[in-house]
Amino acid sequence: MSNVPAELKYTKSHEWIRVEADGSLTIGVTDHAQEALGDVVFLELPEAGRQLAAGEACAVIESVKAASDIYAPVDGEVIASNQDAVDAPESVNADAYAAWLFKLKPANAGDVAALLDAQGYQAEIANA
């Protein structure tokens, strides 16, 4: 069973979202996603300053098995990308919740409430 931390929010497309004290969002891929992908070998992340729409493909994660898009969970502006993860993509496999991919300043903080909680995400992956 995949690790699904209770304090995070989730999307049906397997991104996790941590709401930071300043209201910004830290985003990565879930443990379930990295298990399904296998060994991650490449990441392409959005640049700071890029405006994203909810559901927009904004990054790519490639493994030895497949390449998958990563989607913006809400509308907002990219404020940082994790160069350490780009330099060592295998870090996503080692700890999917420590190896964040990018940070987003949400256009509307209320949009985060509509994302899945841990229980909702667990139900989503159980039915997949």
Swiss-Prot record:
Residues 24-105 form the Lipoyl-binding domain. SUPFAM superfamilies: Single hybrid motif. The keyword Nucleus does not apply. GO terms for biological process: glycine decarboxylation via glycine cleavage system. It holds the Pfam family GCV_H. HAMAP family: GcvH. This is Glycine cleavage system H protein. The gene is gcvH.
